[in-house]
């Protein structure tokens, strides 16, 4: 799931920078009522505990202005935020993994998908609001 929020002009670009800095300095401890387990900061190469702000582990991989808010112990439910490198916008990505069972009907799968999408929209909208507060 992807949501784009467009900004305009130099002030918009500065606002996006403030949002990212604010989320790094003071990450939300929950999104839509769901506890944030860790925040992965791809720029710093670390994962932090949002309650304490302390680094809990180093993270390997590509460096970039990206924050990942992990909402499940298995790491499969997450919301990611990053500024666009080519357009005046900030991008929010949501991902979730819901368990399925062999033999689920089409209606059951459709219902599960709708439930997952509703959860993702709530998490992403919550992160948008948190970013706006900091921008």
Question: Where in this protein do the model-derived segments appear?
Answer:
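General beta-strand recognition
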Residues: 89-91
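A generic beta-sheet turn/junction motif
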Residues: 85-87
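Phosphate-binding and adjacent anionic-ligand microenvironments
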Residues: 1-82, 93, 100-104, 109-135
């Amino acid at each position: 799931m992807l949501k784009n929020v467009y900004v305009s002009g130099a002030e918009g670009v500065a606002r996006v920078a403030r949002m990212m800095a604010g989320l790094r300095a003071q990450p939300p401890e929950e999104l839509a009522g769901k506890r944030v387990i860790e925040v992965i900061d791809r720029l710093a190469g670390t994962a932090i505990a949002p309650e304490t702000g302390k680094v809990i582990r180093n993270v390997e991989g590509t460096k970039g202005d990206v924050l990942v808010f992990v909402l499940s112990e298995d790491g499969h439910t997450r919301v990611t935020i990053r500024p666009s490198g080519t357009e005046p916008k900030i991008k929010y990505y949501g991902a979730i993994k819901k368990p399925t069972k062999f033999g689920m009907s089409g209606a059951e799968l459709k219902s599960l998908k709708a439930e997952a999408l509703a959860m993702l929209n709530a998490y992403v909208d919550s992160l948008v609001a948190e970013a706006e507060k900091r921008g």
